[in-house]
Regions:
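Phosphate-ester processing/binding pockets and catalytic centers
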Residues: 1-194
Length: 194
């Protein structure tokens, strides 16, 4: 996806500035995802919400932002499988190799789910490329949004809109209150008062 976004590699010739070609390519890629993806799940958080919650609870000692969102995705995927009576099937928790704080994520998944997450390169797992595309689109929405008042749906690009409308999904932004609630439920200690 990064080669496409920057018109490099296999997209170096004839792609840069050719918006009609780029949009048609994206539309076709999204249609493939619509045809083959049963559900997509994602979690995001504003750094400011994470830092506010970390002032109250020992959040960063428990989970850094990437592992926090990853664990949330695993929980949502497990809930989806149960709700659709698919929880008897084995589930792999696959994440892109080389992601930050992998050790923390690995440890937490082992403790919570009694199985290790799997690290794979994007080239080895097509699903990671689709997930990377969706994450890129969602990140663009969140990076341009006013945390307090903006309507996210007005920011959807056509391709992201196609994903949202056509594939069952569960994703959203984790707020300070949500992070603090999770810390409380998990019994993570509060910070000592100065």
């Amino acid at each position: 996806m990064s080669e496409f976004a920057h018109s490099t590699g296999q997209f170096a010739r004839g792609w840069k500035g050719n918006e009609a070609r780029r949009q048609e390519f994206l539309r076709r890629l999204v249609q493939i995802a619509v045809n083959y993806v049963g559900c997509w799940i994602g979690a995001a958080m504003f750094k400011s919400d994470y830092e506010k919650a970390d002032k109250v609870y020992r959040v960063h000692e428990f989970l850094q932002p990437y592992p926090f969102c990853s664990i949330t995705c695993i929980a949502l995927a497990s809930e989806w499988a149960t709700r659709h009576h698919l929880d008897y099937l084995p589930m792999e928790f696959v994440f892109e190799a080389g992601d930050e704080h992998w050790g923390q994520l690995h440890q937490r998944v082992l403790e919570d789910y009694k199985q290790a997450p799997v690290a794979r390169a994007k080239e080895q797992a097509m699903a990671l490329q689709v997930a990377d595309f969706a994450a890129y689109e969602i990140r663009k929405v969140y990076m341009s949004v006013d945390e307090e008042s903006d309507d996210l749906t007005s920011r959807f690009r056509t391709t992201l809109g196609m994903l949202v409308v056509n594939i069952p999904h569960k994703w959203g932004n984790m707020t300070e209150v949500g992070i603090r609630t999770i810390m409380n439920v998990r019994g993570i200690p509060k910070r000592s008062s100065p």
